[in-house]
Amino acid sequence: MDTPGMDKWDETFNKHEIIQEFPEENGIKKIIEYLFIKFPLMMDNRDIVQEKKIWKEYNGNKNCFLTISKSIEHPSHPPQKKVVRAEMVISGMFLYENSPGETSIYMVNNVDLKIKSDFVNKIAKKSPKDFLENLTKYCKKMSK
């Protein structure tokens, strides 16, 4: 699984764009990405510009995948009118292959979408489940 291919399986975002990629250094790949989320009518859409670091192996273990992300500003994607700039306070995902065909996934997300807590609570229950279902479908498709 590679983050630049996220748009093939992650339906959370309506747009996923790699703004900048840096050469891999000490086993860490760094990218700057732009994410756009379309919201229901009567609500402004949201976007995020974030820096993501990706380890395809962790502590010498080749059966691990780790990402850590946080919001940043980038001159190529300044805030837009009628789009609220959400803040990715911190996000992380750790995947570990326990055995062939069995993987553990740990996720931490602290995102400020700058909306009322009622709506956040509603989507907070649904989003991680949808994310994992989409990831699982994609992994099964790729393993065939």
Feature map (PLM): residue ranges:
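Eukaryotic helix-grip
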Residues: 1-144
